[in-house]
């Protein structure tokens, strides 16, 4: 489709890497709207080279703040997905986007892309491409098949600390 073509071009991917997933490109939100983009393989996800001007154009018409590309192929067997987050600024890839991971978890549950339970726990890997690996732990709570709550928490790499006195 035209949408897949424009998303693939903005991410520097082949269209087939998105089409092969048989999952839709969708805006999802748990407070911060993100464009969820399924990618077939971890190798393709790591090969993505975003074109930030095209990403900006892509997100403007969708009321989304960043692109959250993911694959179900992971580094750790316990993880549900591996993701990369790209904003429109293009300065640095976001290494641990909790709200985006929550949106991805809701997307995976609502599209039956994972085994669904009343409380579905989905660890999401992120940050490996920028040497700041993190695992974002998500829980999607269901009641009568409807998502009622999404909870996120994370284990990240500390890159600095400070103290502020007022």
Placement of each model-derived feature along the sequence:
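Active-site proximal loop and beta-alpha junction motif in alpha/beta enzyme cores
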Residues: 1-166
């Amino acid at each position: 489709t035209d949408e897949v073509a424009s998303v693939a071009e903005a991410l520097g991917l082949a269209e087939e890497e998105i089409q092969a997933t048989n999952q839709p490109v969708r805006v999802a939100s748990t407070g911060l709207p993100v464009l969820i983009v399924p990618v077939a393989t971890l190798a393709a996800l790591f090969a993505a080279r975003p074109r930030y001007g095209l990403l900006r154009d892509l997100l403007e018409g969708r009321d989304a703040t960043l692109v959250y590309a993911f694959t179900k192929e992971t580094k750790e067997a316990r993880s549900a997905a591996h993701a990369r987050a790209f904003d429109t600024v293009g300065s640095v890839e976001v290494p641990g986007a909790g709200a985006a991971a929550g949106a991805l978890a809701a997307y995976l549950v609502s599209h039956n892309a994972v085994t669904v339970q009343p409380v579905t726990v989905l660890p999401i890997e992120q940050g490996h491409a920028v040497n700041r690996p993190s695992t974002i732990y998500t829980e999607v709570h269901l009641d009568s098949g409807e998502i009622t709550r999404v909870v996120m928490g994370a284990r990240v790499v500390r890159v600095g600390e400070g103290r502020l006195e007022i």
